[in-house]
């Protein structure tokens, strides 16, 4: 008795929840003998919980409740009281078997309540066998100090989850799926709502939203998933840089000549430059021809058709005259300067786009060169009198059978070297224009009153380079008759 009074000086105050009147009277008498006065009795668990939650709450230190009343209420009465009020709940069990009390889903709920119970007493109570105060003292100590005991390992509910109005005293979160009710206080002005904490995590809402976005992106499949992943993982600046790089890169196509494929990687050419051969087909109305235009005092310019390999037209052709293909060119500049030939009109000097000469030319030109003189520009037209010979030669030349037939692809990674003589067409033996006799002299250029004639039979050693990177001819190489 002294030990009990050391814990409960005024005795152990008990609340009794039972609808059996006879058992209620018997239990009240027995508890009084054990210095455990009954301060309140209720017939339902909801009524008892309403009393404990009211403003004029009695000094109750433990609750004795018939387990059948808890089953009929539909919620775990013990867990709610021990979590919110730290009041131990002891179940009262009748002499009948639990399986005979309820059936179906209620039987499963009953087994759950008995398994998680703090303490169970059989009815009727026997004052000689029970030591109620020891059980209550120990369990209250565990609840107040939050020290989990063997029977408290399942208590994970916590109070203080803020409501909509920010009042933490009105909401208690309980991890129990059977708790689905609202408890109204006696004065009616404040409500206490019991909810279920379905989210055991305590992460921030922003982190949760970001995690949901990432999970949604990972779950998405197909084009939609790829689109979302690309926009989330690829910054805008990096995306624009990649697009610009793709636009700047220029790939060699099949219509490029062997010479352009070899030297193009070393050139810094803009994507919009006319040197970029877009691969368009030459109109069938225009037959690919070679035209030469000579300006007074300037080196002759060669007009090449667009999209046709250079080496197909320059087989046996040299920079400053000599053997060449017997392909006629129209004397009218308007017919020559169509859209495809204008691409290479205004580029570098003669021979800058000339392919290396072939050791064995397919055919040579034996007809004399006919020259005409005018006040402005002198046009030299390469013609052939024998058209049948021209047709025979063209039929026998495999490279000219198909104007757009391209040579084998060249690996751009290989080192291809071209000598200056090859680029200028000076590695072949030049035929001086005056060596052709009177006809050649008659067809040569007679410029000025003095009839100055320039011979084009030059060697590389006879050409000097001045500081302006231009060719300078020695004075003794040009003579006046």
Curated annotation (Swiss-Prot):
The keyword Phosphoprotein applies. Keywords: Activator, Cytokinin signaling pathway, Phosphoprotein, Two-component regulatory system. Two-component system major event consists of a His-to-Asp phosphorelay between a sensor histidine kinase (HK) and a response regulator (RR). In plants, the His-to-Asp phosphorelay involves an additional intermediate named Histidine-containing phosphotransfer protein (HPt). This multistep phosphorelay consists of a His-Asp-His-Asp sequential transfer of a phosphate group between first a His and an Asp of the HK protein, followed by the transfer to a conserved His of the HPt protein and finally the transfer to an Asp in the receiver domain of the RR protein. The modification 4-aspartylphosphate is found at residue 66. GO terms for biological process: cytokinin-activated signaling pathway; phosphorelay signal transduction system. InterPro entries: CheY-like_superfamily (IPR011006). Residues 13-138 form the Response regulatory domain. The keyword Phosphoprotein applies. Functions as a response regulator involved in His-to-Asp phosphorelay signal transduction system. Phosphorylation of the Asp residue in the receiver domain activates the ability of the protein to promote the transcription of target genes. May directly activate some type-A response regulators in response to cytokinins. Belongs to the ARR family. Type-B subfamily. This is Two-component response regulator ORR32. The gene is RR32.
């Amino acid at each position: 008795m002294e030990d009990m009074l050391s814990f409960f000086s005024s005795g152990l105050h008990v609340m009794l929840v039972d609808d059996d009147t006879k058992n209620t009277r018997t239990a009240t008498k027995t508890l009084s003998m054990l210095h455990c006065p009954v301060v309140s009795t209720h017939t339902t668990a909801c009524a008892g919980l309403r009393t404990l939650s009211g403003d004029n709450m009695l000094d109750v230190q433990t609750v004795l409740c018939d387990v059948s009343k808890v089953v009929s209420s539909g919620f775990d009465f013990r867990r709610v009281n021990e979590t919110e009020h730290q009041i131990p709940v002891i179940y009262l069990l009748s002499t009948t078997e639990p399986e005979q009390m309820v059936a179906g889903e209620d039987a499963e709920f009953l087994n759950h309540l008995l398994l998680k119970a703090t303490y169970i007493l059989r009815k009727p109570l026997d004052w000689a066998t029970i030591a109620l105060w020891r059980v209550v003292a120990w369990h209250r100590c565990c609840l107040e100090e939050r020290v989990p005991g063997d029977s408290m390992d399942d208590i994970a509910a916590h109070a203080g989850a803020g409501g909509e109005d920010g009042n933490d005293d009105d909401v208690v979160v309980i991890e129990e799926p059977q708790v689905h009710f609202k408890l109204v206080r006696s004065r009616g002005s404040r409500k206490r709502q019991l909810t279920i904490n379905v989210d055991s995590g305590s992460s921030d809402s922003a982190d949760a939203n970001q995690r949901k976005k990432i999970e949604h992106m990972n779950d998405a499949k197909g084009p939609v998933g790829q689109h979302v992943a690309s926009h989330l993982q690829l910054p805008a600046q990096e995306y624009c840089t990649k697009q610009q790089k793709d636009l700047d890169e220029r790939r060699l196509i099949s219509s490029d000549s062997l010479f352009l494929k070899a030297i193009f990687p070393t050139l810094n050419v803009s994507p919009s430059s006319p040197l970029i051969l877009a691969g368009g087909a030459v109109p069938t109305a225009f037959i690919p021809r070679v035209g030469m235009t000579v300006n007074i005092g300037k080196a002759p310019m060669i007009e090449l058709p667009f999209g046709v390999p250079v080496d197909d037209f320059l087989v046996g052709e040299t920079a400053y005259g000599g053997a060449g293909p017997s392909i006629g060119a129209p004397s009218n500049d308007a017919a020559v300067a169509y859209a495809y030939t204008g691409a290479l009109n205004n580029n570098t000097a003669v021979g800058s786009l000339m392919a290396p000469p072939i050791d064995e030319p397919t055919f040579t030109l034996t007809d004399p060169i006919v020259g005409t003189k005018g006040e402005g520009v002198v046009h030299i037209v390469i013609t052939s009198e024998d058209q049948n010979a021209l047709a025979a030669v063209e039929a026998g030349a495999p490279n000219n059978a198909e104007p757009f037939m391209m040579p084998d692809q060249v690996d751009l990674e290989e080192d291809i070297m071209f000598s200056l003589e090859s680029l200028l067409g000076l590695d072949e033996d030049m035929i001086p224009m005056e060596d052709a006799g009177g006809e050649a002299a008659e067809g040569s250029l007679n410029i000025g009153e003095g009839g100055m004639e320039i011979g084009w039979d030059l060697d590389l050693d006879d050409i000097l380079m001045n500081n302006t990177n231009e060719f300078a001819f020695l004075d003794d190489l040009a003579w006046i008759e």
